[in-house]
Amino acid sequence: MPKNKTHSGAKKRFRITGSGKVMREQANKRHLLEVKSSKRTRRLSVDQVVSPADVKKIKKLLGR
């Protein structure tokens, strides 16, 4: 049986911490930043924990 392949899109978007939490980056931090306040862009810089409803599916895509 062939090896399972990791989902390329998922491996670019998510990472798993040492304790097993799935982290993601915030949206809206790529372009048109001069319109957004410094406070907003700072807040968007912080990584977020993925919703528990999505964790199982994401871990499967990452081959975990």
From Swiss-Prot:
Classification via SUPFAM superfamilies: L35p-like (SSF143034)
Q: Name one Pfam family in it.
A: Ribosomal_L35p
In its UniProt entry, the species of origin is given as: Kineococcus radiotolerans (strain ATCC BAA-149 / DSM 14245 / SRS30216)
Does the keyword section mention Ribosomal protein? yes
**What does the UniProt keyword field contain?**
Ribonucleoprotein, Ribosomal protein
* NCBIfam families cross-referenced by the UniProt entry: rpmI_bact (TIGR00001)
Q: What is this protein called?
A: Large ribosomal subunit protein bL35
Say which domain of life the source belongs to.
Answer: Bacteria
Which PANTHER family would you find in this protein's record? 54S RIBOSOMAL PROTEIN BL35M, LARGE RIBOSOMAL SUBUNIT PROTEIN BL35M
